Amino acid sequence: MLIAAWAQSPAVGAEPAAGRVLQAAGIAINVDLPDSEFTGGPQPLLAWIKRSADIVAHYYGRFPTRELRVTVIPTGGSGVHGGTTFGRYGGYIRVRVGRETADAQLVEDWVLVHEMIHLALPDVGENHSWLSEGISTYVEGIARAQMGNRTIEDVWSEQMRSMPKGLPQAGDRGLDNTHTWGRTYWGGALFCLQADIEIRRRTHGRYGLEDALRAVNRESGGIVVDWPIERVFKVGDAAVGVAVLEDLYAKAKDAPLSPDLDALWRELGIESQAEGMRFHDDAPLAGERKAIMKGS
């Protein structure tokens, strides 16, 4: 979940006290962590924060912000129970973690990677939250797979199951005007998938979506600044040399854009079978499929 850089709310509270400094992904992360609240102690949680930062830094070519504060809030039970990202303090994440969370649950967690990805994009405003949430939803699995934290099969399986949630329903008025959960998260992710494929196709594999996102992050500095969404797409397209983002946005912002997902999976060479995922390397977009998970 992303909260605008300027937002004030009771949930934010007073400025957090940084309990320790963790060196990770080339930056110093100030971590507020009540050690005694967690049965496993602080080390698994610190390793989780470092691992998540390394995953995001690998995808973006560097960590998205120059500094970061993370507050770990203890909750009942086990598992990671959600997080919120702010543009304050140069980048600030509050994440809720169960007191009895096991190491294995932290290794498999997606929440903190999702939140750290939010740091990379300028604040584009609430009407365009589909872009920030869509990027985080789409990039999380790919970035983790590139670092061996998740299998490629699992990522494509989730996309096949969940991308239909992002398709427009009756009464849809485009991504900028339809603020349902499905359109915000998976509609945004579907936009990213389409853009990623098209960038790779039109540049003959030279560039991918990550190159556009890296350029946006480098020029803006990420969540700490406000940008109009049009500037995001202009900078991203300039970096890859093709106007994919601007063209796709023009089609999807004010009207329902509903790609044929079954046809898309066939072109990518992805098939879900009872025994697991099967990949067809003779499919028309098999090269683009492999490149997405390999990265640049």
Enumerate the predicted regions with their spans.
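Acidic/His/Gly-enriched intrinsically disordered linker/tail segments
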Residues: 106, 125-196, 201-203, 209, ...
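Boundary at the C-terminal end of the N-terminal hydrophobic targeting segment
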Residues: 7-14
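Juxtacatalytic substrate-recognition/specificity segment
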Residues: 18-124, 128
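Soluble non-cytosolic domains of exported or imported proteins
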Residues: 39-51, 102-107, 126, 130, ...
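Beta/coil-rich, acidic/histidine-enriched accessory regions frequently appended to metallopeptidases
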Residues: 12, 222-296
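Bacterial N-terminal signal peptides
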Residues: 1-5
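Sec-exported extracytoplasmic/periplasmic mature domains
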Residues: 54-62, 118-121, 141-148, 196-204, ...
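Surface-exposed patches in mature extracellular/periplasmic domains of secreted proteins
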Residues: 59-72, 123-129, 147-155, 206-212, ...
